[in-house]
């Protein structure tokens, strides 16, 4: 994928040691991937390759491929649910986690957060999908290795932030041969698509996002 100058903007990589597991590392160790309302993209790249996927005809195929990879991991996800809940309570709840991970406006309200996977060109990434009155935001559960501009490998948490006003549509899909494999495709006005899968509460996540978008359009 050839990237334009606008699309090649990089957030500063941290030089500090980061935690390999769990949410809420030192904020300085979190790498941000955001879609600001100006329609310009800032995103994370590693070894010259973007982890974002431009909308292509094979996007659904890639999503199915990633879902197939999750077969043995879904059981692990369920097992992690209790430990994640304990960590959330320990850190003061989802609201505090959300405000620490992302920039939140005074009038913004967090609706829900759902465990899922985000499909990337590097494979599916486990994390939390936050849905608020202003945006959807994803943060990886574990840190990942990326190359800094100096060529050094650092561990950072992978984050995506998409304002609701930049979402062009949300599509529900499922594997026809494996109906239990369901996906949420979020398409932006700029033509990028994001595939979320492996939800513990798929329909609830879709309904919450649908309601958030409906409320956003009325404002």
UniProtKB/Swiss-Prot annotation:
Q: Which domain of life is it from?
A: Eukaryota
| InterPro entries linked to this entry | GEM-like, GRAM, PH-like_dom_sf
Domain named GRAM: residues: 96-174
Q: Which SMART domains match?
A: GRAM (SM00568)
The text of the family note is: Belongs to the GEM family.
PANTHER family, per the entry: GEM-LIKE PROTEIN 2
Protein's UniProt name = Putative GEM-like protein 8
Query: Which species?
Result: Arabidopsis thaliana
């Amino acid at each position: 994928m050839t990237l334009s100058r606008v699309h090649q903007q990089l957030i500063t990589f941290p030089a500090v040691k980061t935690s390999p597991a769990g949410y809420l590392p030192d904020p300085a160790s979190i790498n941000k991937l955001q879609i600001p309302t100006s329609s310009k993209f800032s995103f994370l790249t590693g070894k010259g390759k973007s982890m974002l996927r431009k909308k292509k005809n094979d996007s659904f195929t890639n999503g199915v491929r990633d879902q197939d990879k999750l077969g043995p991991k879904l059981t692990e996800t369920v097992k992690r649910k209790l430990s994640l809940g304990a960590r959330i309570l320990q850190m003061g709840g989802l609201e505090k986690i959300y405000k620490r991970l992302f920039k939140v406006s005074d009038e913004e309200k967090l609706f829900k957060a759902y465990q899922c996977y985000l499909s990337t060109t590097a494979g599916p990434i486990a994390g939390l999908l936050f849905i608020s009155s202003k945006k959807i935001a994803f943060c990886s559960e574990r840190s990942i290795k990326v190359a800094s501009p100096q060529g050094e490998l650092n561990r950072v948490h992978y984050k995506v932030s998409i304002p609701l006003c930049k979402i062009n549509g949300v599509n529900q899909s499922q594997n026809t041969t494996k109906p239990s494999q369901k996906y949420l495709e979020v398409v932006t006005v700029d033509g990028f698509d994001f595939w979320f899968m492996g939800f513990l509460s798929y329909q609830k996540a879709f309904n919450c996002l649908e309601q958030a978008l409906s409320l956003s359009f009325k404002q």
